[in-house]
Each structure stands twice: as structure tokens, then as C-alpha cells.
From Swiss-Prot:
<feature type="compositionally biased region" description="Basic and acidic residues">
    <location>
        <begin position="1"/>
        <end position="10"/>
    </location>
</feature>
<feature type="region of interest" description="Disordered">
    <location>
        <begin position="1"/>
        <end position="20"/>
    </location>
</feature>
<dbReference type="GO" id="GO:1902626">
    <property type="term" value="P:assembly of large subunit precursor of preribosome"/>
</dbReference>
<feature type="region of interest" description="Disordered">
    <location>
        <begin position="171"/>
        <end position="193"/>
    </location>
</feature>
<comment type="similarity">
    <text>Belongs to the DarP family.</text>
</comment>
<dbReference type="InterPro" id="IPR006839">
    <property type="entry name" value="DarP"/>
</dbReference>
<dbReference type="Pfam" id="PF04751">
    <property type="entry name" value="DarP"/>
</dbReference>
<dbReference type="GO" id="GO:0043022">
    <property type="term" value="F:ribosome binding"/>
</dbReference>
<keyword id="KW-0694">RNA-binding</keyword>
<dbReference type="InterPro" id="IPR023153">
    <property type="entry name" value="DarP_sf"/>
</dbReference>
<feature type="compositionally biased region" description="Acidic residues">
    <location>
        <begin position="181"/>
        <end position="193"/>
    </location>
</feature>
<dbReference type="GO" id="GO:0005829">
    <property type="term" value="C:cytosol"/>
</dbReference>
<dbReference type="GO" id="GO:0019843">
    <property type="term" value="F:rRNA binding"/>
</dbReference>
<protein>
    <recommendedName>
        <fullName>Dual-action ribosomal maturation protein DarP</fullName>
    </recommendedName>
</protein>
<comment type="function">
    <text>Member of a network of 50S ribosomal subunit biogenesis factors which assembles along the 30S-50S interface, preventing incorrect 23S rRNA structures from forming. Promotes peptidyl transferase center (PTC) maturation.</text>
</comment>
<keyword id="KW-0690">Ribosome biogenesis</keyword>
<keyword id="KW-0699">rRNA-binding</keyword>
């Protein structure tokens, strides 16, 4: 309970500032939940009682009304136990980590593509050394066509196809997970820049 402890004279419970901080954290958590797609929301351990409030918050577009609805959602979230809110936070963190890893994997594939276009055969030899299952002839032809398209200002069909081939190779060979010498290739990319 709140109030002073009769024996020691100290206050019991959280201070007002701490309560405000906790309320703002829950409000921010509610904003994150509203920003999720229905598919992402379905993967989270959100109580059924909160789903209609989240959907209503998504529906409202007026700034002040939306903020008021978020505050209403936060009020309902504060009624949930701490374990439920912690589970939602953990699941959101896991989702953001997964998304971050996926974006990083795409960036690595893009760096390989740019390096192949800039360095040509030297970068191709390094890629083939790290990933022997890659088709040398197909990669060389795609690189050549992408350079030709870029020079003639044509649509980047081969450029996109090169990305798709590298992405497929990364998924098959473990480029995304950091296996098969990715760290070597990644550091080589960073050394050249």
C-alpha cells in the first residue's frame, strides 16, 4: 500500500515520478502495438480484451482523437498484470531483432552486388571462393549485363536478377546467418571502402 511506513517513516510504493514513467512506457508500448500489422499482432501474446482497443486506435486518424484512444488503450493495458506486459515487450523485441537481422542480410547482399559491379572478376573470385556452389558463368553474365544496362540507361533487369541470385545463394549457403565465410567477405567489403 501507499503511504508512510509507521515504523521507519519512509514512503511505501512507487513515487509519482516513477508511476508517470511506467505509464509513459505502457503508452509507448500501446503505440508500438497499434503500429503493427494484423499478422504481426497475431503473433504476439496480446490479451483478447485489448484487441478491440488496438483496432479502434488504428481506425481513428484524427490526431487528438487518436492520442485520446491511445491513452484509453494504455489505461486498459495498465489493468493487465506485469507478466503479460513483459511477455508483449519481449515478443516485440524479438520481432525487431528479427527484422533488423533481415535488413542487415539484405544490405550484405546489396554490398556484394555493388562490389561485383565495381570490382568485377576480383570480387567474383572472392565470392566463388567463399561460396563454391555459385554459378560462375551466370554471375559473370549478370554482372556484365548489369554494367551494360547502367551504361545505356536501360531498365535494371540484370541488376535485379543479380540481387535475386545473390539472395538465393545467401539463403542456401548461410550468407545471412554468418556461415561460410561471410565475416571474411563482409570485412573485405569494409576494407575496400
Amino acid at each position: 500500500m501507499r503511504g508512510r511506513d509507521e515504523d521507519t517513516g519512509e514512503f511505501r510504493g512507487a513515487s509519482r515520478s516513477q508511476q508517470r514513467r511506467e505509464a509513459l512506457e505502457i503508452f509507448d508500448l500501446g503505440e508500438k502495438l497499434v503500429a503493427l500489422t494484423p499478422a504481426q499482432l497475431a503473433k504476439l501474446p496480446v490479451p483478447e480484451s485489448l484487441i478491440p482497443h488496438i483496432e479502434e486506435s488504428k481506425r481513428i486518424t484524427s490526431h487528438i482523437a487518436h492520442k485520446r484512444q491511445l491513452a484509453f488503450l494504455a489505461k486498459h493495458m495498465r489493468r493487465e498484470d506485469d507478466e503479460t506486459l513483459a511477455a508483449i515487450r519481449d515478443a516485440l523485441d524479438a520481432n525487431s531483432d528479427t527484422a533488423r537481422r533481415e535488413v542487415a542480410a539484405i544490405h550484405r547482399v546489396e554490398r556484394w552486388r555493388e562490389r561485383l559491379l565495381a570490382d568485377g572478376d576480383a570480387a567474383l573470385a572472392e565470392l566463388l571462393e567463399a561460396y563454391p556452389a555459385a554459378d560462375r558463368q551466370q554471375l559473370r553474365q549478370l554482372v556484365r549485363n548489369a554494367i551494360h544496362e547502367r551504361a545505356k540507361n536501360k531498365p535494371p533487369r540484370a541488376y535485379r536478377e543479380l540481387f535475386q541470385v545473390l539472395r538465393d545463394l545467401s539463403q542456401e549457403q548461410g550468407l545471412e546467418s554468418g556461415d561460410s565465410g561471410l565475416e571474411d567477405g563482409e570485412s573485405a567489403l569494409e576494407d575496400d571502402e
